[in-house]
UniProtKB/Swiss-Prot annotation:
UniProt region (Activation loop), positions on chain: 334-354
Similarity remark: Belongs to the PI3/PI4-kinase family. Type II PI4K subfamily.
InterPro entries assigned to the protein according to its UniProt record, in alphabetical order: Lsb6/PI4K2, PI3/4_kinase_cat_dom
Name used for this protein in its record: Phosphatidylinositol 4-kinase type 2-alpha
Comp. bias regions, Polar residues: 16-25
Bias type Low complexity, positions: 50-60
Domain PI3K/PI4K catalytic: 115-443
Residues making up the signal peptide according to the UniProt record: none
Amino acid sequence: MDETSPLVSPDRDQTEYSYQSQCSPGATVPLSPNGRFSALPGVVVRIPGTATSCGSAASGPSPPGSPCDQERQPLLERSQTRAAAAQAEREMNKFPDDPAFAEVVKKAEKAIMRDILPERISQGSSGSYFVKDEQGEIIAVFKPKNEEPYGQLNPKWTKWLQKLCCPCCFGRDCLVLNQGYLSEAGASLVDQKLDLNIVPRTKVVFLASETFNYSAIDRVKSRGKRLALEKVPKVGQRFNRIGLPPKVGSFQIFVKSYKDADYWLRRFEADPLPENTNRQLQLQFERLVVLDYIIRNTDRGNDNWLIKYDCPMDSASARDDWVMVKEPVIKIAAIDNGLAFPLKHPDSWRAYPFYWAWLPQAKIQFSQEIKDLILPKISDPNFVKDLEEDLYELFKKDQGFDRGQFRKQIAVMRGQILNLTQAMKDGKSPLQLVQTPPVIVETARSHQKSTSESYTQSFQSRKPFFSWW
């Protein structure tokens, strides 16, 4: 083995050695040219006064980086690793740019610590939970990533049955699987950037609760760690975490006094709204159209967006015989945005249409109010680029993030923005907008460096088998 071999310890020659020959007394031992002893038979002994063992009195304190010092490192490193892991978990749910949202998350964490646990929602095809505060009031909806419709720990059996009985129709090949929680947060981000204010604030959050659907291994490990902490505290304190591991998912603020849109739309059909109130509904509806079209929501029916219809009465006049009724207020909340941001337009079995396109509100051309709000933004390339970068920062948090798939998602979104911009400029209606041929706008590849990006536009010719479903 030569001196440059990687198997030679760097500390091999740090201690001086003397060579005592067994051939004849007083014989000198030849040295190699580099000052080391040649390979003659004999006994190697330490020169008196050198370190004899790690931690001995004669050796004194070990210098940093020496083998004796390295022997003391693992325990310290493990404790530092545990502390770093605990600190990382505490910093998972930090939102310095949104203190109001951070306060709601903190309330949820305190409630879970007091065993006021999230409650699983019976509706839907995935594991989603009502999150409560310490008073037991619902404050948010949490959707873990691994309990999504196609997640490994989805507690609902409907998707498993669909996969078993009809595998050809299982999943949506236009979507990135198990990315619904990012889609929920991404829809909220787009809503904020465009000042639509119809999506309840949604962000990526880490939570742990006994009511979540965990694997048997995780539950056994959690019980074992708790038992070790109770019986042998010194051993239990070595664990990075005591309890179930936190789950990553979307955390959406719960909105009160809202009902399914289908309920109110039927009421409004039987009992038409006053002109001013109907105008409010139309303006709110157009915001929903803008959001759904840009993110290409593939799951927008009339049962997963909400309407709040508030008819306040004047409390001052309620004491009299006459009751003054104030003008009603209508607001829309766009929830269930987990099946958006496709990497291609639907072209297989189903078209996944926007069901609001069959409503009478969709036949009215876009108002000047929505044009003034949206057109200056989506017509600005810098704004669109900034939106893409914000979505990139959000989506790259996923462990399975794929840059190529993200580029395809952005290409679809650019095409949607292009169609929406042109439809608003041409004075079209939402119904005419969804009838526009789908477009994909990709970044053009160039071998020459340039300060500006160029794009290529392409139309999708292939149509899904069921164009109405």
